[in-house]
Every structure is written in C-alpha cells, then in structure tokens.
Amino acid sequence: MLLAVDVGNTNIVFALFEGREIKSRWRVATDPRRTADEYAVWLLQLMQLQGFDPKVVKQILISTVVPRALHNLSVLAQKYFGLDPLIAGQPPVEWGFEADVDEPRSLGADRAVNAIAAHAKYPGDLIVVDFGTATTFDVVDFNGAYKGGIIAPGINLSLDALVNAAAKLPRIAIEAPTRTKSVIGRNTEDQMHIGVFWGYVAMMEGLIARMRAEIGRPAKVVATGGLAVLFGDHTDIFDHVDTDLTLDGLAILAERVTVQ
C-alpha cells in the first residue's frame, strides 16, 4: 500500500492507498517543529485503531510546500516504516509534463500534483482552483502542459487581514450568509459575511471568466481544497468539485515510479 503525505501550509494529510483507492486518511496541523517520534505516536495509533498494520505500507510519497517539514517526515518514514520516502518533484518522481512558464522550478509541488491529477481525470483544457492558505488558479492544456496561473490570498487570510486591521470588527466564521439573501447588509456581521463570502465568489468568477477568455477555448473548471464544496454550493462556475485531487495526483505519481 502507498502512504501519501500532502504537506500544506496549514495542514498535513496522510492518506493510505490501495491502488488508486483511498482506504483511510488522517489530518494534522502543519508544524515544522514536530518531531518524527511525535508524528509516529499520532499516526501509528490512528492506523492501528482502524486495523492497519504499518507493515502494509510498501511505499511512501511526500509532497510538500513547507521545506522545513520534510526532514522529520523523512525520518518518520525511515525509522518507523523502514522505507526511504519518495519526494514529489525529485528523482525518480519527475512531474512528466511541460511547464510553459518563466521559471518552471518555482512551480509548487501542490500545484504540479493537481495538474497531473486533473489532466488524468478530466481530459481537455482545464482551470484548477485550489482553496488553501492561498487560493491558486492553474491552467492545464489538453496535452497536460502547465501554462501558468494566478495566486490570490486565501479567504481565511483575507478575513484575518480585515479583522486584524480594523479593531472594532468581530471575527466571523467562513460560511455563506444565512440570515439574509440580500447583498446589502443591515448590521456589521451580515455586512462582513456578505463582503467576505460573496466578494470572494465574485473575485473567483471574475478571474475564471478572464482566464477562459484568454485561453480562447472552452476550459472546464476543477475545484479542490478545503472550501471547494462550500463555494461549489453557491456558484455554477465549477464543472467538477474534487476534494481528493491532490491525493489522487500523488497516487498517480507513485504508480509511475512503480511501473519504472
């Protein structure tokens, strides 16, 4: 079985695969100071609770956008699973697609993995939207080439900036406005919900419309990340909502290495 490790700026997701099927997954907050032993206590207990013997893991693949977290996760793989981990984007785990951008080496692992998975699962011209700490918009053409994209502040970052800079504004949850259907709020909290949520939807729809116009061909939109389902319920701009896209991309990469 494959243990895929997706290290984001906010969370780390561990997923256990049999082939391309996710058998289980576990999530922990990203903290580069966490030791290999601390990861092991947490992860091995969860695996055992669900009936998985660590010996079933034959391959570990790590994708990270937090370089400082890589060392201790590699030690975890070696010390507790007896495996040298594969690292996404490093030999022998090459991306296998053309990156038609100014600095291909600067492409984040998460975005590259998303591009691989999206092309495999949804053939054609694509825009991949990933709601994370930042919200990224990536263009993948019908040949699977990465053509560039957009990086925007994530909605939580936007809300944090608003609340931290305006002393009298309260902290609110990230959710669709429920107390009013109007976009003209009559109290502070409603106005904030409308501004944060519908403002983000408008930004997202506007950017996608501009990207589609520039691509010049019909492009399907694939949404992933923690808030994809929430936004997918309030816009028709998405063709697919796929919260497992990044993990599936890791399984595809691991499969390629096995075939080699």
UniProtKB/Swiss-Prot annotation:
Pfam families: Pan_kinase
EC top class named in words: transferase
Positions with a binding annotation for substrate: G108, A109, D110, R111, T188
Cofactor binding note from Swiss-Prot or TrEMBL: A monovalent cation. Ammonium or potassium.
Recorded catalytic activity of this chain's protein: (R)-pantothenate + ATP = (R)-4'-phosphopantothenate + ADP + H(+)
Pathway: Cofactor biosynthesis; coenzyme A biosynthesis; CoA from (R)-pantothenate: step 1/5
Claim: Transcription regulation is one of the keywords in the record: no
Residues that, per the record, bind ATP: D6, V7, G8, N9, T10, N11, I12, V13, T133
EC numbers, comma separated: 2.7.1.33
Localization per Swiss-Prot or TrEMBL: Cytoplasm
Binding residues for K(+): D130
Active site annotation, chain numbering: D110
Similarity comment: Belongs to the type III pantothenate kinase family.
NCBIfam families: baf, PRK13318.1-2, PRK13318.1-6, PRK13321.1
Protein name: Type III pantothenate kinase
Species lineage: Bacteria, Pseudomonadati, Pseudomonadota, Alphaproteobacteria, Sphingomonadales
UniProt gene name: coaX
